Amino acid sequence: MSDQAVAVRALVSHIHALDDFLIAEPSAGHEHMGAIIADATLQAGVKYQTVVAPKVTRLIRNYPQCVTTSVFLDCLKSDGPERVLGWSRGRKPETAVALAELLIAEDVETVGDFKAWVRFPTSRPKLLGISGIGPKTADYLGLLAGRTDLAAIDVHLNRFLRDAGISPVSYEQAQSIIIEAAKRLRVSPATLDHTIWKYMSNRKEGTATPSCHS
């Protein structure tokens, strides 16, 4: 049996041993390109529910017209990315501008365009060419676009793997373990990603019952 097969078996066994691990489907994504870009570029290294989610909600409320990429980019340039995103530190505002510019160059205007574009094999390398976007954010953009065949490996998923006695040597290995475990559990990789993320987030915050994560 390969090392990966052993790791997948260990992960599935760990999940089956958790009485409070409840499979939950991801919620519907944003129908607003500004929200998608903001969500993806702000989420790294901060608490999603208390930091990112309120800022995305505020952006949708204050900039309802930014449902297309070009209008969102116009707002970023006219009002300033720091004001639009509600974020004034670090490179995240610049990353949001660069991502919007890439999508415009790729003729991605609407959420429908984005959902189609993100599935092209050439799209991920282009995303990774933007400063501030790594493998996790590139995959997270895929999840925001509704892809179900991947997982975005963050600190919560890595910690869950360690709890199962697994120490992946790379992002790609961790992702492969999650994807194979999802097959064993007969759920999509995106659903398993979402469920682990919420389970670990709630456990850290002391919440008893996991729910859904956007």
Residue spans for each PLM region:
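Structure-specific DNA junction-binding interface
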Residues: 1-86
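C-terminal accessory module of base-excision DNA glycosylases/AP lyases that mediates lesion recognition
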Residues: 1-31, 35, 92-97, 108-111, ...
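Alpha-helical ds-nucleic-acid-binding substructure associated with the helix-hairpin-helix region
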Residues: 58-130
